[in-house]
């Protein structure tokens, strides 16, 4: 026993020496068997723990792979002492094992239970966390590698032992670990091996391949100083997502052949163009905003980065082709024009809607509509009875056409203008009128050139003829055709002066010789009487005599029983159809005059724009004849007092005081005679008849009626009037407010209170009427006389005749010496009517005893 006790301290001394000499390469070395002599081992000698050389008992050997010593066999216990990691011996405190001071008593192999017990005890100690080869013991012990608090090498925190991981739980102490067997794996620095000898599972540590190099502190084995790109997996079977084709330094910015990843550059295959950022106004975009939103946008066609992009320039160019929509054109039209403006040139009646596309269509439609009959007219008039369709047939409405007293016929008659302020189409009307005038002037109730009896005004007839009242045969026929194109104006004069005072001047006043018949039977226009009668039948104009209201003579003013009277007459053939509507033009112009006037009127349609009142479109504002005065008087004649051109008002331009706008068209028409027609609703003047109190008007009647001017003066006045009429026929009003007499021409008119005591007598044609007055103004009519003066009682074209009466002159001959023969022709204006062949009327002119077809007029 003494030998044993002497040897026991040697391992402790050796351990101390080893602690001073040994320097482990890495902390946490491989736990090895406890070197050193064991009871029964070979003492002394230098050895390396784990090498199995010396210091161990006979059974000591090398460490196995992984640093685990071979498990001691049961047979090693006893003879040679415990094997590596054996249990403590009998010596107190000197035994090798897990429990200091030899927890298990016994000496050497004398462990209770023998070899089997020793093996079981070792196994239990191993599970308990005891190191294999620990030298020290529990805290306070002296063994190496003991539990915390021990002085052994590799102990737990607080221990002085070498090799243990600080803070490790149950780290394996010991001095071993110097020797490295073949195939041994050196674990990386980190947490020590846990209980049971299994390595820790900390990511990035000790797991090569998953995170080469790791992002944790420390250096990697393959990629020193470089971590793994976040989110980029590596390993077998995984395609590298690093740009540039991989390689040892792929993904390292600035290192390797391709450098690091660039924003917007696709990786891998198939390569897809990346989505460019922005689209809402960033500096560089594809230039296309979503949903067509128009905004600042970027510069189309410039990709981001290094030139890799969608190259949207082409797409952007196409998109720009359509661009963002504007605000639209003008509201309501969308590029089609200004919303709803008023039509053409407002106020220009004659030209319907000039300048507008709708006007052309409207004019065309109106022309066609007028062909079959137009609606009622504009100018307010009496409740005249119209022919079916468009008022009185005939166009006469244009100033100048039928303008001269006596030239008018079934012209402008009653309401007939189509619709609104504009005429249907003056062009069509003028054209129709021109053709109508070709066949002859309107006959009718013009101022009688020569009358021999009562009713001398109407026409030229000798005696009380039964011809057409206020309508020439040829004119009626032409008017019937002309009416095809549209209705005439409203409020025209029905036979201006003709029949104005039936029997008053001619016949009634002896100064004017003749009994004056109504144009028709026995008139200079007899040649066309039959044809006219036929035409008038179609046009609604019947032959008649027409009288003054309650009238006495033939061919008088409204209210008469005859045919052809002024509106209000009973018989057909009047101006306004058959009723009491506004009068027509009446009169007995010449064919040539009417033709020329119609031609002039065609031009006038563009200038007859003045005055949009109740008158005919484009003419005066009143109810008068188009282009004439605004009042109810005879167009262009006096405003109150008198017969056209003789009253005190604004007479015919050149005759009276004023000029009516829109009469430019009448300039040429006036060349052949003044315009006819009475105008306003109900006839010539205001309520009660033709003139105002005091008779027909101011001055006397040319033709040696009392107060008449001398021939020279009359000629000069007529000449001047013709030129003056060029500027328009103006003046408002007619014969006066109260008609011819106090109560008209009837019981209170020409009779007791009419032309007699208070009419043509003391206060009528005498002192204040045709007697003392001055008739046609010599000065005003100076130039008009060239073609024939116009005026009531002045006998168209007549000159003063010494001793009374009217001198014969061309167109109104009383004998075969003058064209027209018989009772005179149509030659108003000094032009004889055109011959139709043969020796008609003594010298081959129409009129003068010829009636109907016997006149020899050509038949179309």
Swiss-Prot record:
Broad class of the protein's primary localization: secreted
Signal sequence range: 1-27
Cysteines engaged in disulfide bonds, as pairs: 850-855
Residues where Hydroxyproline is found: 84, 383, 410, 415
Physiological role: Major structural protein of tissues such as aorta and nuchal ligament, which must expand rapidly and recover completely. Molecular determinant of the late arterial morphogenesis, stabilizing arterial structure by regulating proliferation and organization of vascular smooth muscle.
Family, per entry: Belongs to the elastin family.
Protein name: Elastin
Organism expressing this protein natively: Mus musculus (Mouse)
Upper classification of the organism: Eukaryota, Metazoa, Chordata, Craniata, Vertebrata
The encoding gene: Eln
